[in-house]
């Protein structure tokens, strides 16, 4: 059961059967400049994402970033069949971004003896309302790349002026991301209800 649930993040870091592959190397993408991790910290709701085949069908997905000025961490959670499942990991600015000051960070999760790194690029954010994250992996065996993307919001619903801004931003990245393929998350009261919690990370998880 757990191996199936962990599939989501492992798949993003590697390659999944349901990935859509595009020929050639990852496109040249520029993350946001002057990225401010302190301002970015907080709870982000996953409004929508590009789908992965066979991934968990978690709802009410939230990524919470904490930063005390020196050390950062991430707490990802989602609800499946009344169970709140969560993953805790470390977060740091990507090595090259420490010099360029661009929006790239590394999340490290440990599933027993297995360590998985995920490197989201922040394509756009106003820090207070929305963020658009992006990840691209090149697969030498296929001579192709796969893309993942997420629309994040500090609130459970993306609406009004913020939604308009996000829609316009996605249009500027239409050469990278097919917005029509985004799958929306569910943050309804029913979807977010849970009666127990379960950790996916830790020394006894594999």
Curated annotation (Swiss-Prot):
Predominant place of localization: secreted
Disulfide bonds: 26-136, 60-192
Signal sequence, renumbered to the chain: 1-17
Pfam families for the chain: Lipocalin (PF00061)
Tissue: Synthesized only in the caterpillars, apparently by the epidermis and secreted into the hemolymph. The protein is passed over from the larval hemolymph to that of pupae and adults and is sequestered in the eggs.
Subcellular compartments: Secreted
Role of this protein: This protein binds a chromophore: biliverdin IX, isomer gamma. Mixed with lipoprotein-bound carotenes, this blue protein provides hornworms with their green cryptic coloration which serves a camouflage.
Known partners and oligomeric status: Homotetramer.
Family affiliation: Belongs to the calycin superfamily. Lipocalin family.
Protein name: Insecticyanin-B
Organism, as annotated: Manduca sexta (Tobacco hawkmoth)
